[in-house]
């Protein structure tokens, strides 16, 4: 890993974004987030000869996801005439980067703004990059806000505004790779902490704002594009989808997406989990564990990660640790113990470090890997459970006023 703490603003993506990161022209269809078959159909509708559409779609796919271009003029093997046709009808622009924060530990957080859809306002979401020894993990958001109101999570205090589209989910990955110099012929910013060799973004986790399984189709589409071998080509073993326990979506995820699964568990008794993760009232632990045991492809080589935030005097007793072992019996699993990351207005305290270590020892002795996650990006509110944007849902009166103004 290239260790450098020279985090001067000169290295920020905000100062380098004017040429290739622009606000999408909302009147044009974006090619980002479309499947190759959908790109073929889109090309047919704008007069591209049918015999060329499949070849053109492959060219576009390469330029978008291998070369990482955000301007049709950069597509050197496409004629000027075709470039003009594409520019007239389609967009491949990036969202606006409203803000970028860099933690003292090298973690980066971007605040991205997406254009209004329908009668809504433009919305903002947060995306986080976490550099580690030999790898770089990108934490993606799936929704603007969240419906789940988990009591220890900052995002849960922001009501759901809307789901993100497949385009908007993928755009987070493209922006991060732009900013980190992770596409060919792109430079890594001065002072950035990134893996020395290979890709800067090696792993992605659907652990940002929102519940991915409440936006299943868009998340599925985005992850299948991200893992396509002719494009972004991320291994499905390096993609993790985290859910708070939307049981009906768990089996579908394994069958249709095939990525690694993480469960936001956080408690071993229904009474406690009802308080921490209210969706437990709908899908209690018995149903959740049954779904995990039946996750397609589950094996010692493809374990489920169970996330467990350590809350002082709430869920951190040694009896809780022993109950956790019983709960996971028969499930190939790893347990991530997460020291609670405070946020403005939170009502919980992090467990004492000695207690976290004792808890981990009990779980380890039962044969489960139970790493204690090192908090990353706490100083910029980028750590687990700290993400929140300022976007809010329009009140009904405001929405109607806007609809009338634009003639909908």
Curated annotation (Swiss-Prot):
Give the principal location in a single coarse category. Answer: cytoplasm
Question: Has UniProt tagged this entry with the keyword Iron-sulfur?
Answer: yes
Reactions catalysed, semicolon-separated, are: adenosine(2503) in 23S rRNA + 2 reduced [2Fe-2S]-[ferredoxin] + 2 S-adenosyl-L-methionine = 2-methyladenosine(2503) in 23S rRNA + 5'-deoxyadenosine + L-methionine + 2 oxidized [2Fe-2S]-[ferredoxin] + S-adenosyl-L-homocysteine; adenosine(37) in tRNA + 2 reduced [2Fe-2S]-[ferredoxin] + 2 S-adenosyl-L-methionine = 2-methyladenosine(37) in tRNA + 5'-deoxyadenosine + L-methionine + 2 oxidized [2Fe-2S]-[ferredoxin] + S-adenosyl-L-homocysteine
Biological process (GO), any one: tRNA methylation
- PROSITE patterns from the UniProt entry: RADICAL_SAM
User: What are the coiled-coil residue ranges?
Assistant: none
Tell me which residues this entry annotates as catalytic.
Answer: 126, 384
Q: How is the cofactor bound?
A: Binds 1 [4Fe-4S] cluster. The cluster is coordinated with 3 cysteines and an exchangeable S-adenosyl-L-methionine.
**GO CC terms for this protein?**
cytoplasm
Question: Which residues pair up as cystines?
Answer: 139-384
One Pfam family name is RlmN_N
Domain (Radical SAM core): give its ranges: 132-373
Per the record, the similarity remark reads: Belongs to the radical SAM superfamily. RlmN family.
Give the note. Reaction proceeds by a ping-pong mechanism involving intermediate methylation of a conserved cysteine residue.
Q: What is the recorded name of this protein?
A: Dual-specificity RNA methyltransferase RlmN
């Amino acid at each position: 890993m290239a260790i450098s703490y020279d985090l001067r603003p000169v290295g920020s993506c905000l100062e380098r974004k004017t040429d290739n990161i622009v606000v999408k022209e909302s009147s044009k269809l974006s090619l980002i987030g479309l499947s190759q078959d959908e790109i073929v159909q889109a090309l047919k509708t704008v007069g591209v000869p049918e015999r060329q559409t499949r070849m053109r779609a492959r060219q576009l796919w390469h330029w978008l996801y291998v070369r990482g271009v955000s301007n049709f003029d950069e597509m050197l093997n496409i004629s000027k005439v075709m470039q003009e046709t594409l520019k007239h009808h389609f967009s491949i622009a990036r969202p606006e980067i409203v803000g970028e924060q860099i933690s003292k530990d090298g973690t980066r957080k971007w605040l991205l703004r997406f254009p209004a859809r329908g009668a809504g306002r433009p919305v903002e979401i947060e995306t986080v990059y976490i550099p580690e020894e030999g790898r770089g993990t990108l934490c993606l958001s799936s929704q603007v806000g969240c419906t789940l109101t988990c009591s220890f999570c900052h995002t849960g205090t922001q009501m759901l505004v809307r789901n993100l589209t497949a385009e908007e989910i993928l755009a987070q990955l493209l922006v991060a790779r732009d900013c980190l110099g992770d596409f060919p012929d792109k430079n890594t910013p001065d002072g950035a902490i990134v893996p020395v060799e290979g890709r800067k973004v090696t792993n992605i986790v659907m652990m940002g704002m929102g519940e991915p399984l409440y936006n299943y189709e868009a998340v599925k589409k985005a992850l299948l594009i991200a893992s396509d071998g002719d494009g972004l080509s991320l291994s499905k073993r390096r993609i993790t989808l985290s859910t708070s326990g939307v049981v009906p979506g768990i089996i579908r995820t394994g069958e249709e997406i095939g990525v690694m699964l993480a469960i936001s568990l956080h408690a071993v008794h229904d009474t406690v989990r009802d308080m921490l993760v209210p969706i437990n009232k709908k899908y209690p632990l018995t149903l959740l564990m049954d779904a995990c045991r039946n996750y397609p492809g589950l094996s010692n080589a493809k374990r489920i990660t169970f996330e467990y935030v350590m809350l002082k005097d709430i869920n951190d007793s040694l009896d809780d640790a022993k109950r956790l072992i019983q709960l996971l019996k028969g499930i190939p699993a790893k347990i991530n113990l997460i020291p609670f990351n405070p946020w403005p207005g939170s009502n919980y305290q992090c467990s004492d470090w000695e207690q976290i270590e004792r808890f981990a020892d009990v779980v380890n002795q039962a044969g489960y890997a139970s790493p204690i996650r090192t908090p990353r990006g706490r100083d910029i509110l980028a750590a687990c459970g700290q993400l929140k944007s300022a976007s809010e849902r329009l009140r009904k009166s405001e929405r109607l006023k806007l609809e009338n103004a634009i003639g909908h």
